[in-house]
């Protein structure tokens, strides 16, 4: 199993708006037929205005197979364009689950 964490540093005060857009994005993914185990995480302590989309997938192939389906969806693209306007920076972490 693989855990993918997409970590976004948001613009000041934009967490609630970003979470709402991410929830909408996940709904769009499901309508497109892409079901992934996902969680939305927000900061409690540490760097302010951090949002994480965490995915758990069986392997990298499963992630690679689903990404074109999601990113090719016009509704998802429109949603992500709104979301990206709220982001200062971001990065991705990919981990193998050992236990």
Where are these regions (language model features)?
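Structural preference for beta-strand elements that scaffold enzyme active sites
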Residues: 5, 50-52
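Short acidic/glycine-enriched loop/turn segments that link adjacent beta-strands
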Residues: 45-49
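Short, solvent-exposed loop/turn elements at beta->coil junctions and helix N-caps
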Residues: 39-44
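Short hydrophobic/aromatic beta-strand micro-patches
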Residues: 9, 54-56
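Short, surface-exposed ligand-recognition loops at beta-strand->loop->(often short) alpha-helix junctions
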Residues: 9-20
